[in-house]
Regions:
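Acidic donor-binding segment of Leloir-type glycosyltransferases
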Residues: 101-139
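Conserved donor NDP-sugar-binding/catalytic core segment of glycosyltransferases
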Residues: 172-204, 282
């Protein structure tokens, strides 16, 4: 299998130190590892090794799926090993069965899949599907988790592909994902879910800011990393792995897909994000619909934090970086500058073998990235606290204005509305459950060293 370097991955001039991944990690290479990394960086085919495994798990390199042997090769899976499961619900009595038939016909993307299972999740009136469609009817609506679980119960193939009814797939979409399953540790792979383009301001905004669109860069998926989750709107998974972790949790009406992905990862599996395959998700038709969606997404944060402690932290940074920003926000500029200078200087010997200029750049980049996280948190999970502080403090008002600037320059007032709606959902979940996890920052060392 061949690999590409993550955008964060860089190598020192001597060639025996690699820094990369999410969060950043430092790898010291022996001579054999240096030679192997040369081949990785050149795009040559590389077999399984401990170095490859560590770099993949760190998110420092990403596999390029092909028909060749990958790490831990178990055989090639094809579209014939895939059953597509569609959770469906509608309260529209005029829904056209012909339109259903046309949409269902696109799901295989031109590939000969084993079958398609539609789960009618208590629609009123019941969905009228074309003859020949494999249909499971639920007596009452149980939500997408319950519907997907009923679909999985019908699956006899090695892989199951979940596709929501508001998703449009492209030809060959399965072929672009199946190669990842050459690695037997991979339990699930998700494509990029871009927002479908359309007329109107909402569609234009969603095209650039959909929470389902995780960007153009490949990633290993893990909580607290650059790509911390993937949506279940389009997801291909090993059927046995899904069953082994208990399937989707029907108690979650939103966030059930994130919960499943994190349980797969906790069970020792890998989950991959493959943006080389793009499907399209229908945007909300109105601003009120978008706000309701974002509130629903935020509402799942508290329950997810209770199930997966530490995963929903609004900011992640080192303790020294947190101190520097706390001093800066308190107006103690000289002390903040002193902490930044001291921690930057201390990082140079810690990263022995890394050029001083590189160490300084990493330290300053880390401090700046923490500032962006703080601004995001101030607009999202923390905004009610910021708003209260702004009522009584001129400094808080200035800081709130600074936190709003990144959003205003990338989406304008609509972005502020988006962030605030998510924050409303977070607080709704907190008040309902009493779980404060989505508010607490997480402090950690950076970068970690790997040998």
């Amino acid at each position: 299998m061949t690999f590409v370097l993550d955008r964060s991955t860089q190598r020192t001039r001597r060639g025996d130190v690699v820094i990369g991944g999410s969060p950043l990690r430092l790898f010291r290479l022996a001579p054999a590892g240096t030679a192997q990394f040369d081949r990785l960086a050149a795009g040559d085919t590389v077999g399984a090794s401990k170095l490859v495994e560590r770099l993949v798990d760190a998110g420092a390199i990403h596999p390029v799926p092909d028909a060749g042997a990958g790490p831990r090769q178990t055989g090639t899976l094809t579209a014939a090993d895939v059953t597509i499961v569609v959770p469906a619900w509608s309260n529209n009595p005029d829904l056209d069965p012909g339109a259903w038939n046309a949409w269902l016909g696109t799901l295989p993307g031109g590939a000969p899949v084993a079958g398609v299972v539609v789960v009618d999740d208590g629609s009123r009136p019941p969905l009228a599907l074309p003859p020949g469609v494999r249909l499971v009817r639920r007596a009452r609506n149980g939500g997408p988790a319950a519907a997907r679980n009923d679909g999985v119960a019908e699956v006899t193939t090695a892989l199951v592909a979940f596709v929501d009814t508001d998703v449009t797939v492209t030809d060959g979409w399965l072929d672009g994902l199946l190669g990842h399953f050459a690695d037997d540790r991979v339990a699930a792979v998700a494509p990029r879910v871009a927002s479908a383009r359309g007329p109107g301001a909402v569609a234009r905004y969603e095209a650039a800011h959909s929470p389902l669109d995780l960007g153009p860069e490949p990633a290993r998926v893990a909580p607290g990393t650059r790509v911390g989750y993937v949506p279940g709107a389009a997801l291909v998974a090993r059927t046995d792995a899904v069953r082994a972790v208990g399937g989707f949790d029907p108690a979650l009406r939103t966030g059930e897909d994130v919960d499943l992905v994190w349980r797969l990862i906790a069970a020792g599996h890998r989950v991959r994000y493959e943006p080389g395959v793009v499907v399209h998700h229908a945007p909300r038709p109105t601003w009120s619909g978008l706000v309701r969606q974002r509130i629903a997404y935020g509402s799942s944060a508290a329950l997810l934090a209770r199930r997966h402690p530490g995963t929903l932290a609004p900011v992640r940074m080192s303790g020294w970086t947190a101190l520097a920003w706390a001093l800066l926000l308190a107006g103690r500029l000289r002390l903040a500058a002193l902490v930044v200078a001291a921690t930057t200087a201390a990082l140079v010997p810690k990263l022995g073998g890394v050029p001083a200029a590189t160490s300084v750049r990493l330290a300053l980049t880390g401090h700046a990235g923490a500032g962006r996280q703080l601004a995001d948190a101030a607009r999202r999970a923390w905004w009610p606290l910021v708003a209260v502080a702004a009522l009584v403090s001129r400094r808080a008002r200035r800081l709130a204005a600074l936190a709003a600037l990144p959003a205003l320059t990338d989406g304008g007032l609509h972005r502020l509305l988006d962030d605030a709606a998510y924050g409303v959902g977070v607080w709704r979940g907190i008040l309902t459950t009493g779980e404060l996890g989505p508010l607490w920052p997480q402090l950690r060392d950076w970068p970690r060293r790997q040998r």
